[in-house]
Amino acid sequence: MAPARPFALLFLAVTVGFVLLTAADDSANATATTTTAMAPSSSTDDAAPPVWLKAHATFYGGADASGTMGGACGYGDLYSQGYGTRNAALSTALFNDGASCGQCYKIACDRKRAPQWCRPGVTVTITATNFCPPNWDLPSDNGGWCNPPRPHFDMAQPAWEKIGIYRAGIIPVIYQRVPCVKKGGVRFTINGHDYFNLVLVTNVATTGLIKSMDVMGSNSTDWLPMVRNWGANWHSLSYLTGQMLSFRVTNMDGQTLVFRNIVPSGWKFGQTFASKLQFK
């Protein structure tokens, strides 16, 4: 049987070579569509999956993030609304005309591209609260950081400095969408006037995003569909003044919560009503 050994060894070598070539080809294809990196460690965040997307990040709002208040999502005072200093304005590519308001992202400085400007082993989780508009007077790679199609985060300065060195000004980052963790229940703030009820929805956990919303007054048993007006604001053109209000809210995962009579009949425009219900 000894003469058969050279053939067996040759067959084994060819087989191993084919497997290695196939694995290398698969690896090259994967690299073309995703960025693979070791998940940075963090004392406050859970370990992230190994697949991240590339972007860049700058900062604004000052050392106390006071300049980030307000914004295109309509959250107003980010401190009182529970968003604090862990927030960011998104470029056009990420903002999605306001539909991304409330979404949470885990971000790390990309040490492979700029090790000298990164704080190693740290991630920060932010909530999308604002829009970073394009600057068509400047090129996308020199000042027009938020110009389409660039994915870009203009982060609150305290959040940015968790992952980057201040002198850099702009850093390459890797990011991924993550579930939002919130304290307490979903909150509703009613603005507008008698025939234009504008409802701001805040403190939304899990996806952070609202897919659809309905309202029902106590004078009816019918749910009335609401329309997203801007940012995290939804409106109804029905006359609901003086009625108890219920809201039916569906998030982007398809989970629906009914907030029955969350608003009492004596409500006033400008008031906020906190529920005990939260998406899970």
UniProtKB/Swiss-Prot annotation:
SMART domains: DPBB_1 (SM00837). It is a peripheral membrane protein. GO terms for biological process: plant-type cell wall loosening. It is found in: Secreted, Cell wall; Membrane. Transmembrane segments: none annotated. PROSITE patterns: EXPANSIN_CBD, EXPANSIN_EG45. Residues 70-185 form the Expansin-like EG45 domain. InterPro entries: Expan_Lol_pI, Expansin, Expansin/allergen_DPBB_dom, Expansin_CBD, Expansin_CBD_sf, RlpA-like_DPBB, RlpA-like_sf. The keyword Secreted applies. Glycans are attached at residues 29, 219. Residues 1-24 form the signal peptide. It comes from the Eukaryota. One of its GO terms (cellular component) is membrane. Keywords: Cell wall, Cell wall biogenesis/degradation, Glycoprotein, Membrane, Secreted, Signal. Residues 195-275 form the Expansin-like CBD domain. Pfam families: DPBB_1, Expansin_C. Belongs to the expansin family. Expansin A subfamily. May cause loosening and extension of plant cell walls by disrupting non-covalent bonding between cellulose microfibrils and matrix glucans. No enzymatic activity has been found. May be required for rapid internodal elongation in deepwater rice during submergence. PANTHER family: EXPANSIN-A15 (PTHR31867). This is Expansin-A22. The gene is EXPA22.
